[in-house]
């Protein structure tokens, strides 16, 4: 049976991807900060979901948390990173920028590095990053969001280049949605 982990499955794109994976025969490890929302998702199909609730800003424990989830799943073939944060920040409140960087850069990198090393060790696997077209341009309304998405795009490209040097069945995919009607896209929707 195919096994996947979806980082950021408590809402939005990640939640819908987890549902699609289950519909297509996967067993899915779901992660997010809001455990109650993960439990609600698990209750839709209790035998197909495994919960690993944690915060990406806790990079010290990401490896332990992911390894625990992999043990529950008895392996993993696909890891989708769909977590992220971004707020409009016209006043340039540094705390908003810092939180965006901690999740979208630091946490993202910790998950990517773990996944890359795990899949390289088993010589097969697929890392999918849900980035954004917002990473292609700056934004006066959400400067750190767009900048962190640019980082993700470039980081995944770097991992893709590393994969070419390996003799394995390891894949890296960057998916760049445009504006999507999710809870994160709140406010006036002026990311771009």
Language-model segments: which ranges?
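Conserved glycine-rich Rossmann-like NAD(P)H-binding loop of the short-chain dehydrogenase/reductase
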Residues: 24-40
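Short alpha-helical oligomerization interface
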Residues: 89-102
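SDR active-site lid
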Residues: 154, 161-192
